[in-house]
């Protein structure tokens, strides 16, 4: 049974993606900091027939993240799809003149370095199988910097650069790497089917080869 690991799993997009992939026969590894909330999500997914387990980890702590992914692989099977979508702290959304080096480093640890640790944990199994997908979820500051959102304007482009390089190197190995850019909060986008439309787009990125970056909506239509 294929397995998707959703890093940054929450009751919104993470749960929607879990349901979407669960309908396709995936087991779901839910990873975030709050074990209690993960347990609630596991119960809700079980009620609709989706197999899932929750693993608490802070993406800024490499040992925690690597341990969570290792336990998921041991209990559910090799990770075939990795979704990296932790929601940045509002501390990272400071104006540029308030940005400190320490906060910038933390934002980079949260986004770019966390992704690198996660990829290095799951990639060997994907390479051995010559199959898999890695999907990044980012806001609009991954494409265009905004002075009012300095942390993500620094960290998201670094995460994006790493992802794009992976896309170019791994496409010949049967591993798809893509980024979905969501400019603004999902409720404000007024999608016909709401968050389920976003989950459908992520499923499409998993199943179809293509360019690295996909914009959910044109950047100028979003907030961030």
Task: Place the predicted regions along the sequence by residue.
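Conserved glycine-rich cofactor-binding loop
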Residues: 10-11
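Conserved glycine-rich Rossmann-like NAD(P)H-binding loop of the short-chain dehydrogenase/reductase
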Residues: 25-39
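C-terminal helical subdomain
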Residues: 172-224
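Rossmann-fold cofactor-recognition segment
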Residues: 45-63
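Catalytic loop of short-chain dehydrogenase/reductase
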Residues: 88, 101-103, 107, 111-114, ...
């Amino acid at each position: 049974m294929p397995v998707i690991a959703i890093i940054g799993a929450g009751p919104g997009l993470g749960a929607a993606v879990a349901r979407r992939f669960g309908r396709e026969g995936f087991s779901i590894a839910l990873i975030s900091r709050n074990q209690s909330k993960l347990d609630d999500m596991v119960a809700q997914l079980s009620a609709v027939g989706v197999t899932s387990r929750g693993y608490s980890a802070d993406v800024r702590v490499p040992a925690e993240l690597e341990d969570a992914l290792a336990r998921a692989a041991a209990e559910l099977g090799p990770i075939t799809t990795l979704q990296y979508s932790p929601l940045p702290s509002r501390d990272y959304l400071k104006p540029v003149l308030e940005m400190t080096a320490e906060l910038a480093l933390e934002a980079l640890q949260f986004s770019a370095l966390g992704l690198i640790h996660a990829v290095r944990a799951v990639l060997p199994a994907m390479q051995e199988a010559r199959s898999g997908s890695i999907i990044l979820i980012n806001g609009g500051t991954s494409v265009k910097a905004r002075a009012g959102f300095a942390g993500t304007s620094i960290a998201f482009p670094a995460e994006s650069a790493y992802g794009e390089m992976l896309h170019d190197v791994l496409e010949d190995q049967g591993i798809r790497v893509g980024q979905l850019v969501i400019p603004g909060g999902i409720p404000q986008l007024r999608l016909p089917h709401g968050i389920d439309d976003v989950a459908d787009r992520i499923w499409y990125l998993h199943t179809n080869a293509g360019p690295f970056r996909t914009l959910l909506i044109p950047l100028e239509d979003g907030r961030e």
